[in-house]
């Protein structure tokens, strides 16, 4: 995996995957899409879709654990704080050899800079929430979210997927 290349790709994902509008029905459709993908692939994950301060969709796929729920919460907090994907923040910290605690004073008990939480952005409004998956390796969590966003927004996933391992 090339960190710089992944960061460039994530920036394109974040710029491209923008909703024209977002409401509870869209959140349900997005969460349901993620659940369908997870069930079809046998992924034991937690799925959380929320605007900041308001949960709109939550589901566990059989085999997901309370740890997955906590990781989803902590990754979502990173999106709420930085308005960027948790994977992008984690990769930037990895490049710098730093942690959220030492660079930003954010406690690990509340924030996790691992892949899987992605900003929900609305045209003309900016980032208004997050969609999070937890249960796979972090790159897999991130890509599952991106794939579902592509499906919901009508983008070809192959053009936005991260490349390499």
From Swiss-Prot:
Record's InterPro entries? PduO/GlcC-like (IPR005624), PduO/GlcC-like_sf (IPR038084), YBR137W-like (IPR010371)
Q: One Pfam match, by short name? A: HbpS-like
Q: Which SUPFAM superfamilies match?
A: GlcG-like
Q: Which family does it belong to?
A: Belongs to the UPF0303 family.
- NCBIfam families, per database record: PRK02487.1-4, PRK02487.1-5
HAMAP family hit by this protein = UPF0303
The family database entries (PANTHER family) matched by this protein are listed as: PTHR28255, UPF0303 PROTEIN YBR137W (PTHR28255:SF1)
This protein is called UPF0303 protein BMA1246
Taxonomic source organism: Burkholderia mallei (strain ATCC 23344)
Q: What is the lineage of its organism?
A: Bacteria, Pseudomonadati, Pseudomonadota, Betaproteobacteria, Burkholderiales
